[in-house]
């Protein structure tokens, strides 16, 4: 759910998100497609207006008869999925009390954490986070727990958010520091973890980066394909977004559809790091960007059988 300037912008976002979800599930080896929906609103609703909106959306999802399943993402959560579940069975990520597996945000954060460690290992020869500086952009459902995992492992965590109060709260909780949102790109760090809006990596912003690794949960991080090539040319290791942020999708499909145990989920989340290592090795061997290497792997998986 998001405020879009035009219907065309909303449609384009849905198409980009669905393409990324298709690749995400393919690389993760899960037997599902990649349909995505967006809800375009003039402002983010609350209260009864919000409930009515999600009931209308639930009717649409139900009318598709199961060929499309939905879950939470930007500006939505478990409570919204519970509302959808009142009228449609085809929803992932409902609360545990409503028979779901809960929010996909925490497992997404775990997957990003494993991905960051794999990226550190490739870039520096060690996955040790002790003393590493990590800038986490976004203090929401993924950024907040990710900051905690990183700090617990010894990283120095800087948290930025468009809401300074939220950044302060997360930074205080994890023993890090808040970073003004307008200082994201000029702050020297080992890892920049974008965990908020997409399109953050562009031909304008990539030259400003002062990090060795970009690894975060945001969807559609690349504003244009040229940004991936610029990262490659600058020697900045980019963890392809649909690979590193797959933890939430893996969790809801594994737990709710495939009947996984928590142990099986933990193993699957750790494999995100292993997949990234394979992508990095492929990229190095072929002299291509990590984004291109990930796309090749996704196409291989989609063409199997």
Where do the language-model regions lie?
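Glycine-rich phosphate/diphosphate-binding loop of Rossmann-like nucleotide-binding domains
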Residues: 103-191
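Flexible, glycine/charged-enriched surface loops at secondary-structure junctions
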Residues: 25-30, 67-73, 124-133, 181, ...
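Rossmann-like adenosine-cofactor binding region
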Residues: 131, 162-243
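Hydrophobic beta-strand scaffold residues
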Residues: 68, 157, 178, 237-238, ...
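Adenosine-phosphate binding glycine-rich loop
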Residues: 120, 212-305
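N-terminal ligand-binding/catalytic initiation module
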Residues: 1-98
